[in-house]
Amino acid sequence: PRYIEFEKDKPVTPDQTIRIRMDVVDEIQKLAELANRYNLHVSLNLHRAPGYCVNAGFNEPFNLWKDVAAQEAFYFHWKMWAERFKNVSPVKVSFDLLNEPSFREDMNDQFSAHGPVPGPVYRKIAMETAQVIRAVTPGRMIIADGNNMGGDVIPELTDLGIHQSCRAYFPHFISHFQAPWVWKDPSKAPMPVWPGIIEGQQFGRAQLEEFYKPWIDLVGQGLGVHCGEGGCWKKTPHPVFLAWFGDILDILTPHSIGYALWNFRGDFGILDSGRSDVDYADWYGHKLDRKLLEILK
């Protein structure tokens, strides 16, 4: 909850979810303006919303998928952002409603069992959010992240004029090897290979093509699709990462599905990724992963 007022050492209360720190909102808007100045499009996304975040860590007071109060707070946030950007061209700023939605049994337990949000529930919330946004800024491009943490196409939204966002994290054995927010005991994560067999399952180019086929079919229906996040955490062996990611890009780019790394600089990034098996090049004092750069070109 980057821009709400709350006490970090206490659970978030329902009323705090709509107490907005306008000074922080100003900072976010200025950042978007700076990006636009350099001809970068900004896709504004709520990584944490009232009643849901893919990463637990703050005590949520309610469940976005079950509680009307949470949904009303969610609409409140998007109305605020719509008003903030109503005079900014949709070419410069789009809205991505919520990062990696899933239905988690316990919103406050990172390792709680989870699965897809029921389609009618996702449709209701996405449709009502879009109505709130379009009442203020009618031409705004709206994007919904794939169901089940970004992995699944959402057929329930295809008639709503809402585009969809997939992920480049399949299989998670590759992308999140030993990541502590995924593995309770990172030492038990199986060693990734590409292509090859992991935990008794075959993974390779054919499995990737099968995974992305529904997304490619969605493009064929005339809807926009982008891969809003992707990459590997720093513990994945670099040759495995490059071979796997090269296959993903070979599958997505012929179908005009753009993509983004989770971060530009950091553990998933092209700069300062902190890997132990990369011969970095110096780039203005930063450590550049040149082999990854070549793939991205």
Question: What residue ranges belong to the model's regions?
Answer:
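Aromatic-lined substrate-binding rim segments of carbohydrate-active enzymes
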Residues: 1-53, 122-137, 241-255
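Short, solvent-exposed turn/loop segments enriched in Gly/Ser/Thr/Pro and often Arg
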Residues: 1-2, 46-52, 98, 146-148, ...
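Surface-exposed, active-site-proximal loop segments in enzymatic domains
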Residues: 2-25, 50-69, 105-114, 270-279
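An exposure/low-complexity boundary signal
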Residues: 8, 14-16, 221-236, 240-241
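A generic secondary-structure micro-motif detector
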Residues: 20-21, 119, 205, 237-238
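Conserved Rossmann-like nucleotide-binding pocket used by diverse enzymes
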Residues: 42, 226, 260
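Active-site region of glycoside hydrolase catalytic domains
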Residues: 56, 62-203, 209-232, 254-257
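Aromatic-rich peripheral "rim/lid" segments of glycoside hydrolase catalytic domains that contact
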Residues: 237-297
